[in-house]
Amino acid sequence: LLTPTEISIPLTDAGIEPLLASERSAWNSWDDDQRHTLSASQDHYWHQRHQSARQWLASRPSPIDRDQGDSQEIDRMIQHRIDALAVQQQESREAPNPLASSAVSILQRHCVRCHGPQQVGGLDLQHRDGLLAGGDSGEAAVDLEDRSSSPLLQRIVHTDPALRMPPTGSGLGEADRQVLQAWVAQGAIWTSEVVLPERLVATPLLDDAAFLRRATLDAIGLLPTEEELQQFLADPSDDKRFRAIDRLLADPRHADVWIPYWQDVLAENPTLINASLNSTGPFRWFLADALRDRKPIDRWVTELVMMRGNPHTGGSAGFGMAAENDAPMASKVQILAGAFLGMQMQCARCHDAPYHRTTQRDLFGLAAMLDRKTSGVPASSRVPAAFFELPGRQPLIRATLRPDETVSPHWPLRQVTGLDDSPALDPLLTDPSDSRQRLALLLTSPENKRFAQVVANRVWRRLIGAGLMEPPDDWEGATPSHPELLQWLADRLVASGYQVEAIERLVMQSQLYQRTATDLPVPLDPLQRTFHAPQKRRMTAEQLVDSLHRATGKSIDSEELTFDPDGRRAADNRLSLGFPSRAWMMASLNNERDRPSLDLPRAGLVAEVMQAFGWEGARQMPRTDRPLDPDPLQPGILAQGHLVQHLTRATEGSPLAQMALDAPSPQALVDQLFQRCLTRSPSPDEAAPLVAALEEGFDKRTRAEELVQPTPIDELLPRVTWSNHLVPQATTIQMEMQRRARRGPAADARLEPLWRERYEDVVWSLINASEFVWIP
């Protein structure tokens, strides 16, 4: 603007905004170039590591053909197990299992009174799923990994009457105990347990339109455009699905589906103003750069663990922050263990885990590695010594770390991972004395059997809807439904150089992925997970919000995500997360004390839809799964919420308005809307009432030019910030901003109002169709 030039730039929003967008694009390109240049200095090291990993993989014996690298191997292993189960069920019908019948009868006589419909302690012993799920303790009643140590067997022989089950009388007789012990040793197969017949028959393949919708949502988090749909349907080639998968996985927007996943799993929790419990830096930008640059997952996880860069502007150091936390490195170890090792270590924060094998010493030894110094349990996290001295029942927990005892950095997970810390790792470390770097290597090494398997299982689960191992972040006591398939996928991940896209491609190319979904619940029992079909999945909050904007042709309308745009506060007490262009860029809008004068009303309209569908901006704890239960708020906010009302409005200059003006006929307009919103054409019965609604007045839908008046421009209001939000006018200004946000943008004056409202009703009805929020 200040450089002499012959170009005349009007000082209006329309003149300045394209210039700003061009400047942002130029700066982003420069930033990418700088990052790639710096990253290239490490390329040789990672090439060598991946070559070493492939050599190690080739040296290991395998019961399956690792060179078989196509998706047919997935379908072969799935069908092989279905066929085996069908044979077993036929044999079971011909030869009943008397031991199972006796064991289930014992449970029904002695246990179901409390652990049946009443579910005392959250434990349901009416079926095998309940047996494996456990109760409120989180521990399965039968541990299929260590059957003889199963809590069920321990409780029936306990010498303490307060802990023995059943609690009445003298407990079970010796004969009943022996039956249960033998039954658990066999795997606790239920007498009436059969795999549902539906789970033994593969579902049909999706049609092309439904496949494209599923693949596009899974790969880039958006609905396919009309043009993409039409081109795909018109393509007669046999390999068009494989080519579509390749195109989608190569799309730069592929990163946008994984960023919110890892935000949840890694508990990214940036706070716009004044850090609160477990606030982190905005390491979303580190994740975005790593995923867009297609960094192998072992590389970016290593960079995450190293926690470098500026914690307040997007560096991986932001992961290391945990505000108001008395043991932040212990918290980070808990997150890393759940994310990449399938281990739950939360209990070990204060005491040895009662239902897992990890101890306080394990957790704080790893925390010491991460912190590069000795570590200990802070006083505020200790179980008081008096607790263990209480008379009566023996406590269920132990605290093996003494008060004020410190733990040196060490790796205690050889038994879980199959990998021991040793000097043999030193050649792969630039600084063998750096315990944090050593931890990153131990975590991501191919010899760590858990890392590749956990990552492969997470990829599988995101695309299929159920894991080969459940739950994905707690493998203790669990068994895989398809162990050979899990190992094969893990090996393919290592062989690919830890490229997650390689596993996604294999899964998406399989017939399993391309089948119609089942709405049968995901069984906890691995026996029941046959994968005859993928699970029916609802869009994530991010997919939903982004698809709403994609279908209506509009971008996210939000204020800058900051309460301190003038930057007067120190960087560690305020953030600016910019203007969100994708839903994952949203964040908690809490402003310390919910001060109404600091409201961001337009951002709030987006956030309230996301929250209704399970998103949480404040991630104080990691999580893999969001709430899936139906909530009346979900249809309510799509039907009545301000965001959908604004998006379905044919606003001035919007694609919806232009479609209405350009449509040659009501039928063509309805067809176009169906393709934009539902990725298919309507049936005659579906189209008829919508076409009828648009036919009335269609030829007169455009207003005469002299009747079209320019939209009045709102008065520019002063900006309310942290620096001035306590002045009396601040609340008044914010109330007006909220009113404008709820009102939304003006309708396009070129369209006749009554016809336009009917047209908007048609758009609204498609957005509110139940199939809109479901992935096919």
Q: Where are these predicted regions, by residue range?
A:
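Structured secondary-structure scaffolds
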Residues: 426-433, 437-455, 461-463
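Short Gly/Pro-enriched turn/cap motifs at secondary-structure boundaries
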Residues: 140-144, 430, 588-589, 625-627
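Long, low-complexity, polar/charged, intrinsically disordered or flexibly structured peripheral segments
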Residues: 412-428, 439-441, 737
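Glycine-centered loop/turn motifs
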Residues: 144-145, 402-404
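Extended, well-ordered alpha-helical scaffold/bundle regions in very large, multi-domain proteins
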Residues: 681-687
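Short, structured secondary-structure elements
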Residues: 2-3, 47-133, 157-163, 167-169, ...
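Pro/Ala/Gly-rich low-complexity, hydrophilic intrinsically disordered segments
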Residues: 2-64, 184-199
